[in-house]
């Protein structure tokens, strides 16, 4: 899926997160998680409505859990020009197992308790 891009100021540091990540394991069992995206803009960013639709579209996709961070990374790289792109995914598998997966640039995601929290 190609994401819609928006023009912004070059050099803007951006971090997106969504607690609504849901996709199917190869077994058909659901994985739930939180997606964190971090990058420096080269003059473009993702349209947030399109990004939300993309995240929702993953619900119909079967992936190995270990591949989901790369899949999001690849989609963003194919859609907009960015620098320092990093993806972190915190997953909960059926049975309560927790995983943290990362692809691209290493970063520590800001995990907010509410939308008004400032670090």
Regions found by a protein language model. Give the residues of each.
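N-terminal intrinsically disordered, cationic/polar leader segments
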Residues: 1-119
């Amino acid at each position: 899926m190609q994401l819609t891009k928006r023009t912004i100021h070059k050099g803007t540091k951006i971090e997106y997160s969504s607690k609504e990540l849901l996709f199917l394991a190869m077994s058909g069992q659901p994985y739930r998680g939180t997606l964190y995206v971090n990058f420096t803009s080269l003059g473009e960013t993702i349209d947030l409505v399109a990004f939300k639709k993309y995240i929702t579209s993953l619900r119909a996709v079967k992936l190995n859990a270990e591949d989901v961070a790369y899949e999001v990374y690849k989609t963003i790289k194919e859609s907009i020009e960015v620098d320092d792109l990093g993806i972190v995914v915190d997953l909960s598998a059926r049975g309560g197992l927790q995983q943290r997966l990362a692809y691209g640039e290493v970063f520590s995601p800001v995990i907010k308790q509410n939308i008004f929290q400032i670090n």
